[in-house]
């Protein structure tokens, strides 16, 4: 139980606590008198966000990785998207091995599409088709989809849809 007594600029705070024993604790607190300058409204300062969007994506990806694990029977299909390229890997997390991979840097995809502004939805569909064919050749039919913290729309959605159309089960 805390009580405040005093007048003017000095107050005495008495604290009786059973947690600290039955003794009383006193401490003096010096209070400032009200001034007109402290009551004036202050201008609102808008501060920048502390995290960037890429840091937010990495945080989302770490939360996803806690839930999505690749096994030998059902490896993880991991997607990484940069401004210029799109990368996909099928990973067995128990053995820490990459079983299959596809990217826009591979010759069949890069020669077929002449893109200068980065991967488009059509390019993402082609990468999904290539990874699905590569997985089916190696006997992998079921995968756990790891979108890498990216929203499930646009290139990520097109890649997943193309992989499903060509035989991969998510």
Curated annotation (Swiss-Prot):
Keywords: Chloroplast, Plastid, Ribonucleoprotein, Ribosomal protein, RNA-binding, rRNA-binding, Transit peptide. The keyword Transferase does not apply. InterPro entries: Ribosomal_uL18_bac-type (IPR004389), Ribosomal_uL18_bac/euk (IPR005484). GO terms for molecular function: rRNA binding; structural constituent of ribosome. GO terms for biological process: translation. Gene3D superfamilies: 3.30.420.100. Residues 1-47 form a transit peptide. GO terms for cellular component: chloroplast; chloroplast envelope; chloroplast stroma; cytoplasm; nucleolus; nucleus; ribonucleoprotein complex; ribosome. It is found in: Plastid, Chloroplast. Pfam families: Ribosomal_L18p. Part of the 50S ribosomal subunit; contacts the 5S rRNA. Belongs to the universal ribosomal protein uL18 family. Binds 5S rRNA, forms part of the central protuberance of the 50S subunit. PANTHER family: 39S RIBOSOMAL PROTEIN L18, MITOCHONDRIAL, LARGE RIBOSOMAL SUBUNIT PROTEIN UL18M. This is Large ribosomal subunit protein uL18c. It comes from Arabidopsis thaliana.
